[in-house]
């Protein structure tokens, strides 16, 4: 079997964590299941999926902001709760700032691409409103995999509480707005205190979606 560079990185992190924390250790790109209602903050740390399953000590988990201050969450609330247009909601202004700063917004480099992206988000809202079930990455890609690459990104703080990690913003915001009980997510950073606890991740590893 030939592994990709990403797979090898995941396996190395899994092995390191297992040596340090035992069989219950966090795993890279691990699929967890969280209640969107339990997530009330987002990390100030710049989001990076390369941190997935990484165990980190220190006070990074205290450097958070209220979730409703996240720009993408805020404009999704304006769009889907208050019924505003994307422009009124602030999505266009946010995209313009990203284009000016980085040359792209969510990987889109033109206004035509951004417009199509916003249409896709509208469709996702309609779909999730009807099904009330967010697919795992494996379900979406029709693959047999226990990893949750590209999922809603969730860090775990020292007390085992979820922190939004800044990836999968629109999916996560819509699920929270619709009050969907449980969704799949990709494990991000895990505080060392939580990694040392057998209970911290155990309850997040069971798929309780209906």
Walk through the language-model features, giving the residues of each.
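Membrane-proximal basic amphipathic "stem/tether" segments
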Residues: 1-46
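Intrinsic-disorder-associated interaction segments
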Residues: 4, 8, 66, 88, ...
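Short amphipathic alpha-helical segments that mediate assembly, nucleic-acid/protein binding
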Residues: 8, 16, 73, 91-92, ...
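A short, basic-hydrophobic beta/loop patch
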Residues: 11-26, 47-65, 72, 148-202
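Short, flexible helical or helix-coil boundary motifs
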Residues: 15-18, 22, 26, 84, ...
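Short alpha-helix boundary/capping and kink motifs at helix termini
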Residues: 26, 88, 94-164
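A basic- and aromatic-enriched beta-loop-alpha substructure that forms the phosphate/nucleotide-
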Residues: 44-108
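Charge-dense, extended regions
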Residues: 203-210
